[in-house]
A protein has these predicted regions:
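Bacterial N-terminal signal peptides that target proteins for export
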Residues: 1-8
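Short hydrophobic alpha-helices and adjacent helix-cap/hinge residues
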Residues: 21-317
Length: 317
């Protein structure tokens, strides 16, 4: 069943029907949550907390194990597949999980990159991810900072992931953001796209490049955090050509792997006070970006727990 909430996709592979979900299964295999980031990080912490609270309310009895990949910058990306393999290798045989919950883009991408090698595939839920992905490189690359991967959409490109039973997936609408820019600023000739040195930044840039092919009259200027510090990107922003509009994708980590919060986008804003700015992701919205077509961001931990129990009940009877 496919349910649409704005651009947030929640999907399941079985028709929803009334059922008792409060009885605990006799099978005590755990639920394994694999996080991209430290579980203490705010969004991850809130999602896990809401999940566990609702899971307990619904009568869930299985142990919940949390593993952390502790992903940082995109320069580490060739290591993530092996990290996922090592985590999953701890839960084999009688200890295999009843269900895997993947939280975050990096955990999701790492799972996709090595799922074909898994001998036993258990039901999977993904959350805090987007529909557009790039397939992780299998080996260390010399020029990872200039790698231009293809954007793949798990819906449009029909990826075959039968064990994926449910997901809370954001879909970024770059095309409508560009059309909004053209409607407000019809003289636009260039779009400067800002992305950072994270997996999320690389995937969003790949999507941006793909969608810009629909607009051959527009020039795309990439402001890539894999090759910029906050200081060099501010200097580049000061030298943008006329009739440019800025689109802010994401900014957390620069080429030196320094972490920045809102102060970085404030510095960018101060460098470009007269250039219109939009965002497809809500980054800088309200103080720099004047608008954007956004996913329907909201808390989903409680709904994830409902899906978990429903899926396990469906499988175990």
């Amino acid at each position: 069943m496919l349910r649409f909430l704005g651009y947030l996709f929640i999907f399941s592979l079985w028709l929803l029907q009334s059922m008792e979900i409060f009885a605990a299964s006799k099978d005590k295999n755990p639920i394994l949550i694999i996080c991209s980031y430290n579980p203490a990080a705010h969004q991850t912490s809130v999602t896990i907390s809401d999940y566990m609270e609702e899971y307990n309310k619904l009568g869930g009895k299985r142990d919940i194990i949390i593993e952390n990949m502790n992903c940082k910058s995109f320069s580490e990306s060739p290591l993530w597949s092996d990290m996922m393999t090592q985590i999953l290798s701890k839960y084999k045989g009688e200890n295999h999980p009843a269900q895997i919950v993947l939280l975050g883009q990096e955990a999701w991408a790492a799972y996709l990159s090595q799922r074909d090698s898994m001998q036993v595939k258990v039901p999977v839920i993904c959350s805090l991810v987007s529909s557009n992905v790039v397939i992780l490189p299998k080996d260390t690359m010399e020029h990872l900072d200039s790698w231009m991967p293809e954007s793949v959409d798990i819906f449009d490109d029909h990826l075959n992931i039968p064990e994926l039973k449910s997901g809370f997936i954001n879909r970024y609408n770059i095309e409508d953001n560009i059309r909004m820019i053209q409607a407000f600023y019809p003289k636009t000739e260039h779009i400067a796209f800002i992305s950072d040195n994270t997996y999320g930044g690389v995937t969003m840039q790949a999507l941006m490049r793909k969608e810009m092919e629909k607009f051959p009259d527009l020039d795309l200027i990439l402001m890539d955090g894999r090759r910029h510090t906050i200081y060099t990107i501010v200097e580049e922003l000061r030298n943008l050509p006329e009739n440019t509009v800025i689109m802010v994708g994401t900014w957390r980590v620069d080429m030196n792997e320094g972490y920045f919060m809102r102060n970085a986008t404030y510095a960018m804003m101060e460098a470009t006070p007269a250039i219109p700015t939009f965002t497809p992701s809500s980054v800088s919205l309200g103080y720099w970006a004047i608008g954007g077509v956004l996913p329907d961001y909201r808390k989903v931990g409680g709904e994830m727990a409902m899906e978990s129990i429903w899926i396990i009940r469906r499988i175990t009877g």
